[in-house]
Amino acid sequence: MHLNRVLRETGVVVAAGLLYGSAAFAQSSTIIGTVIDAQSRQPAADVVVTATSPNLQGEQTVVTDAQGNYRIPQLPPGDYTLRFEKEQFKPYARSAIQLRLNRTIRVNVELLPEALGEVVEIVGAPPTIDVGSTTMGVNVDQEFIKRIAVARPGGKGGATRSFESLAELAPGAQNDNYGVSINGSTSPENGYVVDGLSTNDPAFGVNASPLSIEFVQDVNIITGGYMPEFGRSTGGVINAVTRSGSNEFHGSVFANWTPGTLEGTRKQIREEGTVITGQNQLQNLGDFGATLGGPILKDKLWFFAGFAPSFTRYQHTRTLNALRVDDEGNTIKDETDFTVADAIPGSARKYYADSRTIQYMGKLTYLINQDHNVSFALNGTPTSTGGLGKLSVNPQSGGLPGVLATRPGDFGLTETKANTTSLALKYAGAFADKKVLVDANLGWFHQTASTLPGDGSNLGDRTGLAGYSRMVYTTPRALTLFEALPEGQEGACGSTPEEQLVRSPVTGYGVGGPGFMSDQTLDRYQANAKATYLLNALGTHVFKAGVDVELLSFDQVKAYGGGVFFQEGSNYGVAGQGPAVHDARRYGYQTGPDSAVTQFTQVAKTTSTTVGGFLQDSWSIANRVTLNLGVRYDVQALYGGNGDLSLLLGNQWSPRIGAIVDPFANGRAKVFVNFARYYEQVPLNLMDRAFPGENRISARRSLAEPGQGTATSCDPSSFESQQATCNTDSNLLAIPESSRNVNRFYTGGTVGGTPVDPDIKAQSSDEIVVGAEYEVLANTRLGASYTHKDMNSVIEDMSRDDGNTYFLGNPGSGFAGEFPTPVRNYDNVTVYLNRTFADGWLAQANYTWSRLYGNYPGLFRPETGQLDPNILSDFDLIELLENRTGLLPFDRTHQIKVFGAKEFNISNALSASVGVSYRGSSGTPINYWGSHWAYLQDESFVLPRGAGGRTPWINTIDSNIGVNYRVSKDSVVSFTLDVFNLFNFQGVNTVDQTYTLRDIKPIPGGTPADLENLPGRVEFQDQAPRDEPFGSVDGDVNKNFKNPLSYQAPRQVRFGIRYTF
């Protein structure tokens, strides 16, 4: 280290700078360091070290020990000033120390004797390497947020600018259906923490609180390598701490607006097999609100409050088309091999999808004395979308309406509401001169979620929308069979039924009521406490131990409109029985053979109790080696709808072992390795569906074409026929004797719980992380890491008798030994360069190579969007197990993320900043999906995973421009302009992977060549035989297969204005 002696009046030097230490996802941070005599180079004992910050009530004071070491724990993140004082030394104050969330930073100091007239000054910037931790991830604060375009409009939490959206900034992270996938896991596997308490949905595991980044001070995205203090997550952790008051009144008034008029052109989605097109266009999206914080009693009692409504409106244009034909009546293809279609004049109809959220929060922080404080926080996020005649924005995924292949008047039938309320009480205390620390949290996270009929009818009613069943026709039919064409265009699709089928085919067309509906109430009661003890013995030990308890409950009423969801299906291959309609989903039971009873609602309240504890030690040796050692134990008891204990998951021992070496002992480099085992906390949806099991019955009925119902044939397009013929036994089709049990017409209906393997093991994954970092320039570090993750035991339901009965176990072991072992192997190599914001600019860049391979995607099925943790369809049926091993849906071989920003000071009052970001990623695997006679669409892998190649690369460039004008000393007006997808790239996000809607068998180990020269190469499933070979009937192969289903979100421009005081 280069030293330069200069004469000076002050008498101190900061020697080792800021050395980032242990990171975890608690809600406070720590400053540590060593103080020495600059002349004698000996430790300086009994030096008084005082920390102050605008975010800290009062001040925190400690005294150095005999070795000159000090530790100031339980600090909120913020900018700090440290004062060092002792009689024989000149006093010193070091300011502008940035302490981020969940960090331990080191500030080493050399004090000069009072009599010495010169000071030893260090030339160069302090190191920025985190030498005490193996934790991987990124920390996002308000400094980054205001300079880089983040929280893209649209998507989940888009209008609210949810803290969860920041997770995709981390290397190895990507957006998935319900949030952000981290290192190959699915979003419900992540832990979501706000102010020390979980915001995970107790039933499904996803983040349930889209809390605005306006209310958040820091967000820490942990991708792996964390200590045993934290568990119940097999993915990453998104940890946020909300803002607090201070000794000065401060606040903001803000507004953000994304107008649809400036949106880039959306590429039209063209679908084969249907003449209905749909286009979503943003109308308005934004949020506005205010925050205020300050003292009620200075240095004693602070408050912070915020209020932020947000709104979203999309316009969906539904258009009817007619296929163009030649002189011989054959359809015409264009140069891209799409069938040429002409829009029918006057057919375009506009519908609106609205979403509204009101967010609020309040927080009180009380300082009992210097060593003890408590805080209480309240926040809520009520959201509503849809309504009668309106479309919905899915609150769980942010998904927009797809093509409305549904009869006009039969969509826009429900209103969806999602409301969360969180209460959190936190205590932090220090004893024995801050050698013993105690932290405790107590909280309640309450949710209501419902999708109910828009006309006000109640679930289970036989009248109104609640009594109206949904029907889907899977075989191509003429549009004119369901809808009247605009006046004057009656002949646009032809004049005969045959011509109309050629020129206006629709596939997967829906009629009827709202389908599945539910009304849910969920609660998560949480309590945890931990104690930390600092010991100097053969180095420095930070021992920590703790316990925590979580009580979950899930109360749900669920129903299908009219008591049943109909879908066109096979007639069992019996000649003369004609077309069939399948009771695809009907709740009910049987009191005897063929004595079915329909349940118009199913009601269940399920609960869970989880108790855990941990012990860990972070042992630092000679400022060169740190060993992080610990173990965690959890046990979860789950209770079914009858109140009985249904599943007990113990023996959840989670070892965590890490080592960090600082080879030069100067904080400018590190090499590290870590092993960890993580266990899942099973969400309650499993209990709701399986304990006792869902009572479902199924049958097939004689299907009448729309408008042609009779006393013995069901016309589900008619409400009257649904209420009469479709719910009687007069139109039932007999099950072939070869597959018949005691029932001639019905399957299912068995009442009872799901058997559980007595040796079932909790679900877990293992992780190994190896990496190195080196500070190549001041504030700039270069790093590389390798991560491997794989699954141990997985909990899933399975069936040996074609779905008549199910049991719960670990596929591949125990009672389920003949089922394939779940595999999800993830390998990741990341190279990154990070420059923290300094000297007016920041830069971050990372490249990730990864591979995700196996037969188990996670806690939801990306293929169908099925969100049923631990009870997915992947291992249900033996006949569907073929071809499921391969590259998994979120396998992206390459990912590149680059962020940069520069700030310009134009005058004392005026400044500006420019930020640019680039994200690029390779495509995802394409599959060949088929249908299943009982599980319906996209449940069968006709060919092995990934046999269809990959989707294209996706490239996105975003920009940020900010202008700040200082009105007075403490008030600033800011204007921001965020442009997302600056060049309006329209890369293909997803393609249609439905090869067929027919119930065909997988081809084990097959290739695309096996599907050439149809018919005759593919077999139908045994329960859905057909006389005509597959490929001989129009509609057997999906005409839209591999065509784009979605493109990148277009260019969107967000304006922001803010007054801060």
UniProtKB/Swiss-Prot annotation:
Keywords: Cell outer membrane, Membrane, Signal, Stress response, TonB box, Transmembrane, Transmembrane beta strand, Transport
Domain TBDR plug, residue spans: 121-243
Gene3D superfamilies: Carboxypeptidase-like, regulatory domain, TonB-dependent receptor, beta-barrel domain, TonB-dependent receptor, plug domain
PROSITE patterns: TONB_DEPENDENT_REC_3
Domain (TBDR beta-barrel) ranges: 248-1061
Family stated for the protein in its record: Belongs to the TonB-dependent receptor family.
Function field: Required for secretion of the protease PopC across the bacterial outer membrane. Binds and probably transports PopC from the periplasm to the extracellular milieu. It derives its energy for transport by interacting with the trans-periplasmic membrane protein TonB. Required for cellular adhesion during fruiting body formation, a multicellular developmental program that is induced in response to starvation.
Subunit structure of this chain's protein: Interacts with TonB. Part of a transport system composed of the outer membrane transporter Oar, the trans-periplasmic binding protein TonB and the inner membrane proteins ExbB and ExbD.
This protein's domain notes: The TonB box in the Oar plug domain is important for PopC secretion.
Protein known as: TonB-dependent transporter Oar
Organism: Myxococcus xanthus
Lineage: Bacteria, Pseudomonadati, Myxococcota, Myxococcia, Myxococcales
